[in-house]
């Protein structure tokens, strides 16, 4: 997910994207805790995507 793609979305779409990412992060953490997650780098990717979305939401709210 690129930041340029996110800037084109509305705040409502970004909030929906954020909710989906938070759910995905929760599922990945549960898989990691139970030892079912083989691709642990997905946790890092999702965490950074959440940060990207939150940053764009904050910048749109301030503008």
Swiss-Prot record:
GO molecular-function terms, A-Z: structural constituent of ribosome
GO cellular component: cytosolic large ribosomal subunit
GO annotation (BP), single: translation
Keywords tagged on the record: Ribonucleoprotein, Ribosomal protein
InterPro entries membership: Ribosomal_protein_uL29, Ribosomal_uL29, Ribosomal_uL29_CS, Ribosomal_uL29_sf
Pfam family, one: Ribosomal_L29
Keyword Ribonucleoprotein: yes
tRNA processing recorded as keyword: no
SUPFAM superfamilies associated with the record: Ribosomal protein L29 (L29p)
NCBIfam families: L29
Recorded family membership: Belongs to the universal ribosomal protein uL29 family.
Name used for this protein in its record: Large ribosomal subunit protein uL29
Annotated source species: Shewanella sediminis (strain HAW-EB3)
Organism lineage string: Bacteria, Pseudomonadati, Pseudomonadota, Gammaproteobacteria, Alteromonadales
């Amino acid at each position: 997910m690129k930041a340029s793609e996110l800037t084109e979305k509305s705040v409502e779409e970004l909030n929906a994207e954020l909710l989906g990412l938070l759910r995905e992060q929760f599922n990945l953490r549960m898989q990691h805790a139970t030892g079912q997650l083989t691709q642990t780098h997905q946790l890092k990717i999702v965490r950074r995507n959440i940060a990207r979305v939150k940053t764009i939401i904050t910048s749109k709210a301030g503008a």
